[in-house]
Amino acid sequence: FQIARMFPMWMEFAPSALSIVVWVGAITAFYAASVACAQSDIKRVLAFSTISQIAFMMVALGASLPAHSSEGILDNHAQLGYMAGMFHLFTHAMFKACLFLGAGCIIHAVHSNEMSAMGGLRKYMPITHITFLICCLAIAGVPGLSGFFSKDEIITACFHYSPVLGWWMTLVAAMTAFYMFRLYYGIFWGKDNEAYVEHRPHEAPWTMTLPLIVLSAVTLVGGWIPFGHFVSAAGTAYDIHLDAQIAITSSVIALLSIGLATYIYMGKTQPVADKLEATFPRLHRWAYKRFYMDEVYQFVTHRIIFRYISRPIAWFDRHVIDGFFDFLAWGTQRLSLCIRGLQNGSVQAYAFVFAVGALLVFLIMIL
């Protein structure tokens, strides 16, 4: 959001930095989507999905081309990327909030975050099921829902920036549809979990389901809001339009990804995580471990920064910086002791010091 607010400054003074924003966002989107495909904790799936979707927004901002018309106004391609990123910020806030709240209702019902402790919940939680499905369809980019419009605009901006970037983000969008419906089928389809015998799941109270209904309703109609009339990089209205070829291609790919997830997971009795692990054991382990980014972070921070950077800096701070100020304090104390000796209450001593001082001033004046 800060990049979006400061976007005119980026375009004017650092347009080359937007290229870094584009490719860092593209790599982050793919990384987070890959990790989400292997997680079994529903909150982690949604968390990495959020990382991926925020990366989508960053890519859109970076893909805003720094070109200007003769009047000095940003061209349509530049406005498209900016508008698409902010539009996706709005639509994503709606359906992702609904998904997280729905996950809270599910965890409240089964007392677990793991998909292995779920299954068949559509019979027990109909409202949560329908609202969750609507938001999964939206984030997957199914035509007509809010996520389709904003994500399609981002992909269009990416194709204007670079065909490679456009296809890359289309792949990430396909992965998004796949892992979201992997999550959906793992929670609401399949056979009932054995734990349901002792603790039967139930729908959340209306205080929890009412926000789901409101957010899913906004998700249904949010894409039809003329967002371009409110937000554009140049501060002028920008009419949203769909590139038919890109829209059809991205829609078909999203539906194929949903179909693949449906074929693999719908109605199956084997736990979701076990299927991926059995089919791609090594790749699944890498993705489940988040490609060992946590271990890399721990190594860099503890083995390198703390040992070879932080410790020398701490020694320098303790012995040099603190030592210098300790020396100043010691010197000031010693000087005060010496000066305090002059204040002995003897008038003769005061007169002597005054005379010596006056003599020194006289000598300085005549010399």
Question: What do these predicted regions represent?
Answer:
Residues 50, 205-217, 326, 347-353:
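Select subsegments of transmembrane alpha-helices in polytopic membrane proteins
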Residues 139-144, 220-227, 262-266, 362-366:
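Alpha-helical transmembrane segments of multi-pass membrane proteins
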Residues 96-99, 174-183, 254-275:
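Hydrophobic alpha-helical membrane-embedded segments
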Residues 1-203, 216-218, 224:
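Hydrophobic transmembrane alpha-helices and their helix-loop junctions in integral membrane proteins
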Residues 2, 132-133, 212-222, 257, ...:
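Hydrophobic alpha-helical transmembrane segments of multi-pass integral membrane proteins
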Residues 201-260:
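Hard-cation-handling environments
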Residues 135-139, 211-226, 290, 305-315:
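Hydrophobic alpha-helical membrane-insertion segments
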Residues 228-246, 266-367:
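Aromatic-capped, Gly/Pro-kinked transmembrane alpha-helices
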